[in-house]
C-alpha cells in the first residue's frame, strides 16, 4: 500500500483522488490547497460539472474529508516545505498545482518528509515519464514528471508509427478544450494576449511544448516533431492532429493495422482504436491516454499522412498520474 498526498485540489487533483480511491494499492492520506477550505473541498469533490457527481458518500469534519467513511486530512499551506508529510508517512506527494514543477521547487515535498514526488505537469528539469512509452526507463528517481496530457496522447501514437515506418518529421496541432487558466470574458493576460480572450466564444491559437517534449521521452524523435494548440469552447476532451512524413512507404490500411495491433497488445489501456463515427463527447471519462480515430485520418502519398487521435485531457491524464504513482512506488 502506497501512502499518497495530493498538493493542489484543482481539476487534476480532484480526479486523481477519484481514480486513486478505486485502486486497492493506493491510499490518499492528505490533500493540501491554500485556496480551498475543508467544507468547500468536500463540495468540489462531490459535484463535478464535467464528470458528474461522485458515486460514493462525501462529508467532512473540522480538518478532513470523509469519503465512504474514510478520512483524508485537508491542509491549507502555501509552502509545501511546511506540510507534515513525514509525520503522516507520505510515500509519494503528487503535485498538481502547476506551480512546483521543477526539481528545486518540488524538492520542498521531500524536505517536508515525502519520499518521492510525481509532478502532474511538464518539467524542464525533472525527468519525464509517459506510461506506455518510456516508463521502463524509470530508475528510482526521487522527483519525476508525468509530462502533459497532450504529450501522453501524442507519444504512444508517435512511438508505434515511428517503430513501424519511421518518422522523418512531423507537425502536430491539438484542438484543445478550455482549461482553468483561460478567461470567461476578455481579461488581462500579459504573457499571452490571445489567451486573455473569452474562452467560450473563440478559437484561440496557442503555443504548446507537447510535441517537442515527445523528444524527451522518445530520444529517437528529438528535433523531429513540433506543434501548436487551438483552444476551443468545449469543456473537456481534446484531439491531436499529427501530420508526418514517413521514412518508409505505407498504405493507410497498413498504418491502421499496426496501430490497431498495438492497441490490443502492448499498449492496451493506453492507446485505444476506433473506426466509429465519433465526436469529442464520446470520450468523456475515457481512461486511455490516446484513442486513434481510424476513420478521420487521411493520406496524401505513401510517405505523407495525417493521423487523428482523441484524449480526455482531464480523466485520461489523471489515470496515468495514478499509474505512474504505482510504478514509482514499486521501484
Swiss-Prot record:
Residues that hold NAD(+) according to the record: 11-12, 33, 78, 313
GO CC terms in record: cytosol; external encapsulating structure
Pfam family, one: Gp_dh_C
Pathway: Carbohydrate degradation; glycolysis; pyruvate from D-glyceraldehyde 3-phosphate: step 1/5
Principal cellular location given in the protein's record: cytoplasm
InterPro entries: GlycerAld/Erythrose_P_DH, GlycerAld_3-P_DH_AS, GlycerAld_3-P_DH_cat, GlycerAld_3-P_DH_NAD(P)-bd, Glyceraldehyde-3-P_DH_1, NAD(P)-bd_dom_sf
Gene Ontology MF annotations: glyceraldehyde-3-phosphate dehydrogenase (NAD+) (phosphorylating) activity; NAD binding; NADP binding
Subcellular location: Cytoplasm
Enzyme Commission number, as recorded: 1.2.1.12
Quaternary state and interactors: Homotetramer.
Protein name as catalogued: Glyceraldehyde-3-phosphate dehydrogenase 2
Protein source organism: Kluyveromyces lactis (strain ATCC 8585 / CBS 2359 / DSM 70799 / NBRC 1267 / NRRL Y-1140 / WM37) (Yeast)
Lineage: Eukaryota, Fungi, Dikarya, Ascomycota, Saccharomycotina
Amino acid at each position: 500500500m502506497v501512502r499518497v498526498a495530493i498538493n493542489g485540489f484543482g481539476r487534476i487533483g480532484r480526479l486523481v483522488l477519484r481514480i486513486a480511491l478505486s485502486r486497492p494499492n493506493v491510499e490518499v492520506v492528505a490533500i493540501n490547497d491554500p485556496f480551498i477550505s475543508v467544507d468547500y473541498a468536500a463540495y468540489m469533490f462531490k459535484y463535478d460539472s464535467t464528470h458528474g457527481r461522485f458515486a460514493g458518500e462525501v462529508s467532512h469534519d473540522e480538518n478532513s474529508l470523509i469519503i465512504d467513511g474514510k478520512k483524508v486530512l485537508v491542509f491549507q499551506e502555501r509552502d509545501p516545505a511546511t506540510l507534515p508529510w513525514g509525520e503522516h508517512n507520505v510515500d509519494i506527494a503528487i503535485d498538481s498545482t502547476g506551480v512546483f514543477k521543477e526539481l528545486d521547487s518540488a524538492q520542498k515535498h521531500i524536505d517536508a518528509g515525502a519520499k518521492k514526488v510525481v509532478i502532474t505537469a511538464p518539467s524542464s528539469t525533472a525527468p519525464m515519464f509517459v506510461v506506455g512509452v518510456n516508463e521502463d526507463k524509470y530508475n528510482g528517481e526521487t522527483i519525476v514528471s508525468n509530462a502533459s496530457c497532450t504529450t501522453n496522447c501524442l507519444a504512444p501514437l508517435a512511438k508505434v508509427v515511428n517503430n513501424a515506418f519511421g518518422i522523418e518529421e512531423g507537425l502536430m496541432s491539438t484542438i484543445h478544450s478550455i482549461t482553468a487558466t483561460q478567461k470567461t470574458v476578455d481579461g488581462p493576460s500579459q504573457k499571452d494576449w490571445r489567451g486573455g480572450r473569452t474562452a467560450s466564444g473563440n478559437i484561440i491559437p496557442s503555443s504548446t511544448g507537447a510535441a517537442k517534449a515527445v523528444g524527451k521521452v522518445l530520444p529517437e524523435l528529438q528535433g523531429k516533431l513540433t506543434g501548436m494548440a487551438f483552444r476551443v469552447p468545449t469543456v473537456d476532451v481534446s484531439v491531436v492532429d499529427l501530420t508526418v512524413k514517413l521514412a518508409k512507404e505505407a498504405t493507410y490500411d497498413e498504418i491502421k493495422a499496426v496501430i490497431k495491433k498495438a492497441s490490443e497488445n502492448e499498449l492496451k489501456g493506453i492507446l485505444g482504436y476506433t473506426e466509429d463515427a465519433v465526436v469529442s463527447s464520446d470520450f468523456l471519462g475515457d481512461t486511455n491516454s490516446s484513442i486513434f480515430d481510424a476513420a478521420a485520418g487521411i493520406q496524401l502519398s505513401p510517405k505523407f499522412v495525417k493521423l487523428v487521435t482523441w484524449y480526455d485531457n482531464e480523466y485520461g491524464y489523471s489515470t496515468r498520474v495514478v499509474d505512474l504513482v504505482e510504478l514509482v512506488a514499486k521501484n
